[in-house]
């Protein structure tokens, strides 16, 4: 186009600048000859390099307008679903969508409605989709099928030469390594230090601050835009001055369109639906502007979205500038109760208890104490204070319930 070719004067010398715009994802790979695996090249800074077969396959996958997470995985069935994970999701779904007819469906039918199980009438085939297995599957089948993908959360707020992280969530044999569990484990840790507004009736959404929404959007964006058929790590790093979210797969859209908002080309639209149905993620294309607005409100540096075309990954960095006055306010708030509309320390902990119960109605007091970093006796005092939290039943059938305030 004409705007991509123009003269430019440098040190009194006129040169002609020819800008080669990035090809649309639906047109990639652009190649020479008849074989894309032999004729595809990409520019890495100072030169053009032959694309690897993995890179070409990734570009071909990205041509699919319907995303790739609806792919039926042969030989994978409902036996590969971790029912405990699925039922935790259904508990949250039921809480958010009380009158939804899907609540009465059997697990397999419910999963089909979400896009996690699919029938292919033409091929007369059926089975779990990529979205279904990755979101709710057992750890071993997931690692067998997606052996080049990892999940990793690290808190590096107080590291030293011999301490590389303060907290970590990764494959360690203590949990079923699916995406829903990863979100469940990481989100409370990610937002643990953020203040909450003084509104207790809206457990899931109304008590969100712009920062809570931004962190959630960053986490969800990392998942719905990840290329799970490639190689890499879903990585979240929490530091004192920043949060970093990394996913495998390069950007499908130019950065300027992403920053502008209103455009969404998720690689995993079925996962996007699954998360949106429980209150995670808003209108398509609005996620990144939500993050930008939250950071602008705090007058923090603009979020940085960086693409590494060598490692084939994208990293979103959210920098947070420390403010001594803000720290002083938090200290005063903890000692004296609510201040400027934020929750007191105990009310904040009760809100976190409610989140834990919604995730897992059978959560134990010991698990509550471990997550909140307090003693079991302190947990019991909080439970005694929270009149809307009740324990029903006994033995294996016992579980927590939350009574909505009138």
Spans of model-derived segments:
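Flexible, glycine-/charge-rich segments associated with ATP-binding catalytic modules
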Residues: 143-144, 254-341
